[in-house]
Amino acid sequence: MSATIASLRESLCSETTPLPIRFRALFSLKHLAVQNKGTADSLSAIDAIAAAFASPSALLKHELAYCLGQTGSDAAIPHLTQVLEDLQEDPMCRHEAAEALGALGKAESLGVLQKYLHREGEDVSVKETCEIAIDRIEWENSEERKQEKLRQSDFASVDPAPPMPEDDEKQTVETLEKKLLDTSLPLFKRYRAMFALRDLASPPDLPTAVPAILALAKGLKDESALFRHEIAFVFGQLSHPASIPALTEALSNLDEVSMVRHEAAEALGSLGDEEGVEETLLKFLHDKEKVVRESVIVALDMAEFEQSGQAEYALIPEVASKAS
């Protein structure tokens, strides 16, 4: 293991390291795992990320699972499967592990995802995530996928669902909003509409950007907490000021589930240089929900980073310079 990876692993796994530093270490390790795919360094980085699943922080663990899903590496599958199978684990982490297995797109994960989709008494967000992940893996390995024409996205993330294909009639914000909010459609199809709307909102000066943001914001009223949290996540990716009112409302609603509120806090962190955002986040620094408190700490660190003009939210200079 390289000295860099060993040092990042130590920062990530230490409970005495401040949470924002642990997050930066995590993003640095994810970057190294992706850049060096297939090498011993990549495997060491993946093992380093997985080692932090011993942490008591649900926020950190759910982010570990997300990052493992973004590595594109089969070496992450056993770690993620173990988290999904651990019924003592926080449902937020288990859901993220299921989503990450979907992102990796390997048919070998279908069995375990089917198991928890149909498990009696399973948490709804875990069930729904398994349903979407199964659909994503089946799509990933289908003939249909090869025929589809997908718009080039501005985002490098591997998403829970691809955007709607471009050849699916003429895509307008209105037609996509209709699909987004149609609860009779499978979640996978609605997610496809969500990511197509995201892509119509970037770059932020597109004429479709603000209408797409306002359409997405309506999804924050959906009955599915999983769906609402994904809308907040997309807003974090877009960092568009038009989403601030909807995100502030979601974070401020104490009756909203913590899975959604924490995602809204992190999304606001990506908008940290906008007026009033830091003040909003500071109000929730002592929230009753630990995951919200921790998200606010990370969001405030991200806000500081946004204001500083640094190139990349990572820990080590060489990762920052490579990633920028």
UniProtKB/Swiss-Prot annotation:
SMART domains per UniProt: EZ_HEAT
Organismal lineage: Eukaryota, Fungi, Dikarya, Ascomycota, Pezizomycotina
Reactions catalysed according to its record: [eIF5A protein]-deoxyhypusine + AH2 + O2 = [eIF5A protein]-hypusine + A + H2O
Ligase found in the keyword field: no
GO cellular component term, pick one: nucleus
Record-linked Gene3D superfamilies: Leucine-rich Repeat Variant (1.25.10.10)
Region (Disordered) location: 143-171
Organism name: Neurospora crassa (strain ATCC 24698 / 74-OR23-1A / CBS 708.71 / DSM 1257 / FGSC 987)
Cofactor stoichiometry and binding remark: Binds 2 Fe(2+) ions per subunit.
Protein name per its UniProtKB record: Deoxyhypusine hydroxylase
Primary gene name: lia1
Free-text function comment from the UniProt entry: Catalyzes the hydroxylation of the N(6)-(4-aminobutyl)-L-lysine intermediate to form hypusine, an essential post-translational modification only found in mature eIF-5A factor.
HEAT-like PBS-type repeat ranges, renumbered to this chain: 60-86, 94-119, 189-219, 227-253, 260-287
